[in-house]
Amino acid sequence: MRRSRKGMKSGMKDFEAKTSPRQKMDTESWFIECYRNNQGHPLRTLIHLYKANYHKFVMAVICFFAKHACVWVLPIITANIINDVTSHNPDTFRNIIFYSILEAGLILLNIPMNYLYTSYKSLATRYAETGLRKALIRKLQQLSISYHVETQSGRLQSKIMRDVEAVEGLSTQLFLSILNIALNIGVALVVTISKSRIVFIFFLLTTPVAAITMVTFRNIMKKRNTEFRKEMEETSARVMEMVELVPVTRAHALEDEEVAKMSGQLFAVAEKGYKLDLIQALFGSVGWAVFQIFQVICLAFTGYLAIGGKIQAGDITLYQSYFATVVNQVSSIVTLLPTIAKGIESVNSIGEVLLSEDIEDNEGKEKLEQVTGTFDFEDVCFHYKNNEHNVLNHLNLHVKSGETIALVGESGAGKSTILNLVIGFNQAESGKVLIDGKDISKIDLRTYRKHLAVVPQTSILFSGTIRDNITYGCENVSEEELQKVIKAANLSDLIASLPKGLDTMVGEHGGKLSGGQRQRISIARALIRDPKVIVLDEATSALDSISEKLIQQALNNLTEGRTTFIVAHRLSTIRDADRIAVIADGRCAEYGTYEELMALQGEFYQLKQIQS
């Protein structure tokens, strides 16, 4: 596993060396800055995303021109041969040989030029595609926890995968198709005006028709694409939710209800997709029919000019070929508009994330090199967005360095909110949360969290091995340290029973392990960081009685000298806590040792009696 990761990193470095520009800021930040500097201008944003690779596009254009030379020269050669034959030129045969060799040479030139063109173009477009995804991932790591709570993960996944793919498709179409269109039209018009101004003027008459067709449908296309994109994001989120909840729906025999609910969502997507398909079909067919009629008119017009002696007979094939080129290329623009509209909408969709200001701002704040673990909650109030009711009401709490504090209370009392304040996920609406006497809102949380370890209520494992999950984010972990943590987390027997031991794959989200096993790995991951502050959100809830007892003993030893916050509904698990804080109505209703609170016979006593 480790070798493969090193190989992946090496491959990424090689690719970045070929594609990444030498910039003062990292690639992800540079992409975000491109969006910020071009807000409201998706095409300008797209162009700036490639700014660092303009030189590759220039080389690609040169190669593109060289590889298509055979196509542009062939109509001229054909017309010249016909004119030589019809005029009985004595050098006709020699000219045919010369033209054939010239065309054959240009055809063979296509092979190396196409390879070089694809190489330059692909490096530039793949760089942008990778850069956008990295920028999105970096931004998602910076966005506040409240943003992630309010935004469905399926929508974010859709932006990272589907929208970036659409932007890459837009880039390819703009470069490959638009470049092809521009050069084909340019060459055709230059050759035409050099031979006949009358025919050139006729060619220009097709432009207004193309413009009218495009303007008519552009606004409709934009609206339909926006509706379809949002519906797809909603569907992606619903599908992800459905997959995660399959065990719940199966356990309660709700399969039919879930299928019916998803069917409604899928039909909504189908309806919007159908309307989009109709618009695209109408758009394409109207454009095609209009330009085909003009092509027939061109044939009649050039034939009339040849009869009048204003052009040679061979020139009819030249103009017909070039007119077909102009018509087909302008028609291609019309056909491309749906793809362009979809890509532009995806550029805007990505911007919704990259330009979000709901981020955790650590710039310019004080960095914490050391943490002792003293906490003070001074008159803290907090409420969640779209909810005027305060979860915490003037909370006051003092926690000494090295103390183990247990937070108890009914569901919704504010226990998890306090933990989120300790971690820094939430910030107090009023009052202060102090860490070692420093306002937590004024410190660089990234430096603070290096001294923090969290075991959440729901164990979260990453795809990979048990070793990868325990040592996640830690470098140079010795085997001795690892074995110590494994023993403390009661994982020794589990690992010994597995054929591959620590190198056993855990599956997606740890699906190959039981809930208790996953939780113990999460605890081991927290312990190996040797933190100064530990947050345990019902960390023993998923363990059986025997494992819970062993883990509790290990935690008592390992939390010594570290400030520890514990949330537990089972009050028997917190008997050894230094202090117990009873949270009720967002306040600290009672605070003391287990014995003190039992003797008080207040709220803690009542909770204990209920559980007994």
Q: What annotation goes with each model-predicted range?
A:
Residues 57-113, 193-198, 309-313:
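Transmembrane helix-loop-helix hairpins at lipid-water interfaces of multipass membrane proteins
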